[in-house]
């Protein structure tokens, strides 16, 4: 069978949790609480092969024209088979359909994202008034996007990248 990229369902969260945990142990993804995964299930797509979830990725809308690619990961035995590329391509298409103009990511996998047109940036690519509004969010990912001191230990070594759609 071939790999199917589809929207995640609540029944996929346990598999998504396992994939994230594998990468968290390697310090390649930030840990996420299970409750957060359920709250954000509608943001996720999964890669499914023969009924098994083998990869995931999420699109989080930050502002009117800006989204963030989060948690793109594929289980080890299926890495190198372009599944991550299929996941990211699906996320990019979802972003375009939503009317987003830019996608942000915070990553160690710079070559992977550069292969899709992402460019390295510094700082938060938003106007000062939008920055102030984003400060009101409780989402830790937005704190990472804003490069706040409180989350710097979590993001050390990551590269900030941006794609113009």
What is the predicted role of each segment?
Residues 97, 101, 107-135:
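Conserved active-site alpha-helix within GNAT-family acetyltransferase domains
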């Amino acid at each position: 069978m071939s790999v199917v990229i589809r929207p995640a369902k609540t029944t996929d969260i346990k598999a998504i949790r396992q994939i994230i945990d594998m990468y968290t142990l390697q310090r390649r993804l930030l840990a996420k609480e299970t409750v957060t995964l359920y709250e954000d299930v509608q943001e996720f797509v999964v890669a499914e092969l023969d009924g098994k979830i083998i990869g995931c990725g999420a699109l989080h809308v930050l502002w009117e024209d800006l989204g963030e690619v989060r948690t793109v990961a594929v289980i080890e035995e299926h890495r190198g088979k372009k599944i991550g590329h299929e996941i990211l391509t699906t996320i990019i298409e979802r972003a375009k359909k939503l009317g987003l103009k830019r996608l942000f990511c915070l990553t160690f996998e710079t070559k992977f994202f550069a292969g899709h047109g992402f460019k390295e940036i510094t700082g938060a690519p938003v106007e000062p008034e939008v920055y102030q509004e984003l400060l009101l969010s409780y989402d830790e990912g937005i704190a990472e996007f804003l490069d706040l001191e409180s989350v710097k230990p979590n993001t050390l070594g990551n590269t900030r990248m941006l794609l113009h759609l």
